[in-house]
Amino acid sequence: MKVMKDNTKIYSSRQEHLVAKLVDGTVVAGSGARDLHPGDVRNNEFLIECKTHMALTDRIEFFADVWDKISSEAESRLKFPALVVDNGTQTLEGSWVLTRIGAIQIANCKMFECPCKISVNLKFSHDQFLKITNMLHQKFNTPIAYVIPFNPQSLVLLTLKDFVEVRFK
C-alpha cells in the first residue's frame, strides 16, 4: 500500500506547490499530519486545503466535512479558509476554489448565483461549468464568482485563475 500512498503524494505535492506559487504562499511542512500541521498551503491571509485526483476526471466535488475542517482550522489562526479542488490535472485551468464571500474583492469580479445543485456536498461537471464560466468571461471581460449558500454560510466559487486575479493582483 506504500506505493499507492507515495503516488498520491506526488500528485498532491504538484498541486500544493502550484497553489503556493500562485498565492505567494508556502506549502505546509508535513501537510496531511492534520493535528500538527493544518492545511496544505498558507500565506498571510489564507489557510488552504488542496484536493486532487490521480486520474483525469470531469467531476469536481467539494465535500462539506473537508470545508468544515479547513474553515475551523483557518478561523483558529485568524485566516480565511479556502478549499482548492481540481480535475486531476494539477493545473491552473483545472482547478476551482471555494472560499468565504468576504475573502475576495467582490468589486473586482462579476457575481452570479451558482447554478449547481447542492445537497450535502457541492458537485458539478468541470467541463460544463468551465464552458459557462468562459462564456461569461468573454461577455463581461472580468473574473467570475458564483455565490453559494453552503453550510449556512455565503461562500463563493471561482476558478483558481479568477481567485488569484481577484485576490492577489
Question: What role is predicted for each listed range?
Answer:
Residues 141-169:
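Charged phosphate-binding loop/patch that engages nucleotide di/tri-phosphates or the phosphate backbone
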Residues 40, 95-96, 155-156:
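A residue-level structural signature of the nucleotidyltransferase/glycosyltransferase Rossmann-like core
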Residues 17, 46, 52-146:
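Catalytic cores of nucleic-acid endonucleases
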Residues 2-75:
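Catalytic centers of nucleases
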Residues 8, 37, 42, 88-89, ...:
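Intrinsic disorder/low-complexity detector
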Residues 1-15, 111, 115-121, 128-132, ...:
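Interdomain/boundary linker segments immediately adjacent to catalytic/signaling cores
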